[in-house]
Amino acid sequence: MQVTETLNEGLKREIKVVVPAGDLEAKLAERLETARGRARINGFRPGKVPTAHLRKMYGKSFMAEIVNEILNDSSRSILAERNEKSATQPEVIMSEDEKEAEKVLDGKADFVFSLNYEVLPAIEVKDFSKIAVTREVVDISDEEVDEQVKRIASSTRTFETKKGKAENEDRVTIDYLGKLDGEPFEGGADNDAQLVLGSGQFIPGFEEQLIGLKAGDEKVITVTFPAEYGAAHLAGKEATFDIKVKEVAKPNELVLDDETAKKLGIESLERLRQVVREQIESQYGQITRQKVKRQILDALDGDYQFETPQKLVDAEFNNIWQQINFDLQQAGRTFEDEETTEEAAREEYRKLAERRVRLGLVLSEIGEKAGVEVTEEELQRAVYDQVRRYPGQEKEIYDFLRRTPDAVANLRAPIFEEKVVDHLLANINVTDKKVSKEELTAEDEDAASEAKPAKKAAAKKKAEEGKSEEA
């Protein structure tokens, strides 16, 4: 096999491979001889089938197998010999001339093909011990815990029918019919719907217009669906609702005790408070980690600048772009609605894709140098969590993951990344800073400015939360 480098520009490589016809013939002769000892063909004694007869019957199919084996093995062996790592599976380019292909299968021509690929850039891990980040910490007050406990326990609250007008926190039972331009719309009607006024269950402006109504009252209210409403055909639209009030009920006093906790499946009120505190701590902890991770990624982004494999960038951009367009479509909006153009959006998200790929490569190199590994137990837990996301399809999803290595690799990647972040956190300067809940949850100005187009609080946020870019 003759291997010749025909392109070496930046990360791009092209390798021409020539397998002489004589080498192919030698492999075919060896395979025919092996088959001769096993062949069972009518008219011939076992092991006595003439090679020429076997060649006539199986020569082309055997040669096709040999060619496929060469193609499958060549990428791995050539990359190993050149001490290179391909960013993606090398592209194989062969002649499309059918007559030429027939000559190869007949053993009358050399087998010639090319491998096109991009190599992973060589990355020298720099000293990251001087990276400094601020970790925001919120002290969770008893008042905040009690407020959340009350909110959760309110689901157990009972109501008592009353004759007066509906007030805030009363529960009303209504029939309603929604209309757009005077015509009923799908999903806009219900009977005996129960709604606690002030709960925010319905769209803004709906509940407020029911205050003051009594059982038996009828009213037509007008509301405007939010621009970001999930149903695109309703987003930003003005609609009317024909309302008929069937019952008004006042809330009974909410008692917080062990019995209330038991109704929620918790053994005691004290344990309920503990569970709620742990949930709040977990929520704040996730926000804090994402903010710290963004700071780390920003620092690494400033330290590492190198050419990125464009095929990886293309794949990452396509994933982002698909999500952006899906979010816009769901919201019934366009790039013009976001005060930008498709061209400008493409340019921005292309930069985001390049950043993701670059940081992903940096984190991978840091993790490899540090000996970070994903254990089998961690991977199995991720597989189990993924399977649980599809109730009723568990076996199909599990079988898919078992036979699809790339899908399992996609589950492994975020685990590996988080372990690399843990490694970095243990070796950089981290300063804790106490902040309020409002300060912690406030949207980062930089993230907000980057969020054009495709909705600051929606599409861009989703795009930024993928892969190695929670920042």
Curated annotation (Swiss-Prot):
EC number: 5.2.1.8
Gene that this polypeptide is encoded by: tig
Reactions accelerated catalytically: [protein]-peptidylproline (omega=180) = [protein]-peptidylproline (omega=0)
Basic and acidic residues bias spans: 461-471
Domain writeup: Consists of 3 domains; the N-terminus binds the ribosome, the middle domain has PPIase activity, while the C-terminus has intrinsic chaperone activity on its own.
Function description: Involved in protein export. Acts as a chaperone by maintaining the newly synthesized protein in an open conformation. Functions as a peptidyl-prolyl cis-trans isomerase.
Matching InterPro entries: PPIase_dom_sf (IPR046357), PPIase_FKBP_dom (IPR001179), Trig_fac (IPR005215), Trigger_fac_C (IPR008880), Trigger_fac_C_sf (IPR037041), Trigger_fac_ribosome-bd_bac (IPR008881), Trigger_fac_ribosome-bd_sf (IPR036611), Trigger_fact/SurA_dom_sf (IPR027304)
Disulfide-bonded cysteines: none
Residue span of region Disordered: 435-471
Species: Brucella abortus (strain 2308)
Membrane-spanning residues: none
Name by which UniProt lists this protein: Trigger factor
Main localization (coarse): cytoplasm
Top-tier EC class: isomerase
Domain called PPIase FKBP-type: residue spans: 169-254
